[in-house]
Amino acid sequence: MNGEYRGRGFGRGRFQSWKRGRGGGNFSGKWREREHRPDLSKTTGKRTSEQTPQFLLSTKTPQSMQSTLDRFIPYKGWKLYFSEVYSDSSPLIEKIQAFEKFFTRHIDLYDKDEIERKGSILVDFKELTEGGEVTNLIPDIATELRDAPEKTLACMGLAIHQVLTKDLERHAAELQAQEGLSNDGETMVNVPHIHARVYNYEPLTQLKNVRANYYGKYIALRGTVVRVSNIKPLCTKMAFLCAACGEIQSFPLPDGKYSLPTKCPVPVCRGRSFTALRSSPLTVTMDWQSIKIQELMSDDQREAGRIPRTIECELVHDLVDSCVPGDTVTITGIVKVSNAEEGSRNKNDKCMFLLYIEANSISNSKGQKTKSSEDGCKHGMLMEFSLKDLYAIQEIQAEENLFKLIVNSLCPVIFGHELVKAGLALALFGGSQKYADDKNRIPIRGDPHILVVGDPGLGKSQMLQAACNVAPRGVYVCGNTTTTSGLTVTLSKDSSSGDFALEAGALVLGDQGICGIDEFDKMGNQHQALLEAMEQQSISLAKAGVVCSLPARTSIIAAANPVGGHYNKAKTVSENLKMGSALLSRFDLVFILLDTPNEHHDHLLSEHVIAIRAGKQRTISSATVARMNSQDSNTSVLEVVSEKPLSERLKVVPGETIDPIPHQLLRKYIGYARQYVYPRLSTEAARVLQDFYLELRKQSQRLNSSPITTRQLESLIRLTEARARLELREEATKEDAEDIVEIMKYSMLGTYSDEFGNLDFERSQHGSGMSNRSTAKRFISALNNVAERTYNNIFQFHQLRQIAKELNIQVADFENFIGSLNDQGYLLKKGPKVYQLQTM
């Protein structure tokens, strides 16, 4: 915070006026003048000065006496914080003095203009308890704050109010002396009500422990924002007009709950009927917002078979509009209760209450800037690292073959598939997002998307769950039970107020993390909802008059089974999945897993499965990889690594033991890399990627195959940055680029190879065309000739079969062949066994 004091002159509004003598001048900014009785003839329009009863005219004297007595209270803002009468023997005085000493010592660390503008001050709980100013006078300050939070926070607020008042009075006296004005009278300053916001409060309470015994206690909890309501004005004090005498009183409404006064403040008046004056200057309102927090599930807190718990939180004053759905926040506040259903007809529901949190401070993990550069500010989900964590991260980073260790630690239960695991590991680390906060440029996503397609039983779902478990922020959903609104965002209607509120879906909750989607092929129409989120990394909503955009900066890892239950290499990826090319082209890597018999591989796989079932899996809880037993001690690991391709380097050779990194520690390592490491491409790495991209473009033009666009080049750059970030390096080297080129070639090998194992570059990589394009072209050309000759573009199924027989077209399944033409838009099905040619 800025320790400089700014704005001490009249023009900055530091104080309003001062008295030049005991009887001279009136200070217009005093809050006590709000208690003066207004002119009844203007307020009600009914009474005049002649009609006013005599007992009303006598009420000025007690108020004037009270205003005079207030001057002898040493704390100017006592009435703003406490309802009871000031007493020198009050136990609160000692607390206020302790907090006053604390704020007086640290006043230079705070920006006074900012405190007065916001009406709040941030107080670090660790500084409060570690410093001697408070703990010497209040030894059990933590217990006092936990058990009596409202009184303790009011004491803090009054203490900073007193410190600022004295500071302003001192500067007012200096200004009077500089301008040669007399200093005979009392200087009056107007400091607003200041709320003390305590942050860094410990310990964090788990949401499952927040029960009835926490009512009235001060707690801190961390969770994900899943719903945010609109900002509304909440009335805390209401002006009421007495119907009998016309007296106006300001009646407090605790927690914003409406209630009527029981009696008139005038002693001789017995009026019991009151009218609310909402536009009166005595009516006080504040900004109010409600959010819903969902608990964060960690390893030791996961409970099978139950949905995550949620709790409502109320934000007031300067806390409103401090978070959006999907943010991870730490909230400190007071646990309170509210009626379950205000308008319920059932009498039993009147005894049912709901717990909610009245927020005192909120810390948004995403709102804090982690690093700035010329490309814009990168925002990250801030994690906390202990000294033990940092030593473990340093030990992991010091490994020679770190890529191999992380790949084999990702999912040790699944044998093989090293390059697929490498792609998933690169998605966990991710690349660097460019131009995130530059409004003059379109942001470029840095999160890669991975698709794993293959036969059932090869461990796709387990690798997917392992990736979501290792990610610092991972959301796992299953495609066959997911709706479009569950993936993106839901617009729900609040039952109490009738307003619309946003509820975040899986992609928004996985912001700056991983979203794993299993059974990707069974999602139905939900694929269209992913198109915007995968490329623009945001979700736009336009429903019920609400138009907004929410961030969804997440890496999507999807696993899919082919339609027929077995992957048919005679078809393309699109035909196997029945999925559009627009969605498939957004995936950086598409891996094809096939269950092909291999005697050596099957022998190793069976040994691996039996060892795991027998409990012989090595689970030593350290982060080191054992040195290669089969390798000569004089040979450097780097020399061996540089000679072998990546697929060989990642394999665990017989006789070698790998001690995998525990997932809890690997999650810390990934979080540290995403938070602090932002690599850039070196010149050599950029040249390798450029040469590979140009070679792909040359082949696609020469062979008339699927188009290679800049999406492939951006994918290469993203994955290369992730490869450097995996080893905590700020620069991506030539070796990183070569590894990524090998992974990309492996991914393309599965999509381009046909049923005979040959590389057919005329096949569409993303499957927008037919498996055998020339056969389809010949058949459609023949249909065009027949339609032009007969002036009829309607064909029966037996006519289509006869034309194919005349052309000597050999296909394995003719019905499937016609269905593919229907999917591609060449034929339109008009009825049972009736098709219309669309190319006329």
Swiss-Prot record:
Its EC number is 3.6.4.12. It catalyses: ATP + H2O = ADP + phosphate + H(+). ATP binds at G454, D455, P456, G457, L458, G459, K460, S461. It is found in: Nucleus; Chromosome. Pfam families: MCM, MCM_lid, MCM_OB, WHD_MCM8. PROSITE patterns: MCM_2 (PS50051). SUPFAM superfamilies: Nucleic acid-binding proteins, P-loop containing nucleoside triphosphate hydrolases. Its main location: nucleus. Residues 30-40 have a biased composition (Basic and acidic residues). Signal peptide: none annotated. This is DNA helicase MCM8.
